Amino acid sequence: DPIPCTRETAILMMADAVEAASRSLPEYTEESINNLVEKIIDSQVEEGFFKECPITFKDIAIVKSVFKEKLKTIYHTRISYPELKK
């Protein structure tokens, strides 16, 4: 993949990697989804994929948060709360 030059192409690159990796998760829990998103995007940052584009750490934090919520919705992950007795 070419190195992205715009914030939009950087976000698309993150989305593509996270979505592809999410398909191979053995289970879809809040923790596994959070860990996956952090691991994939942090490794892209460390590998210098975004050094040519004007994306900020704040932008990346927002992207991570949105991806986590969207994946939880896609995979119907529920936060486990204690059962309420009726």
Q: Where do the protein language model's features map onto the residues?
A:
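Terminal helices and disordered tails flanking the catalytic cores of nucleotide-processing hydrolases
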Residues: 1-86
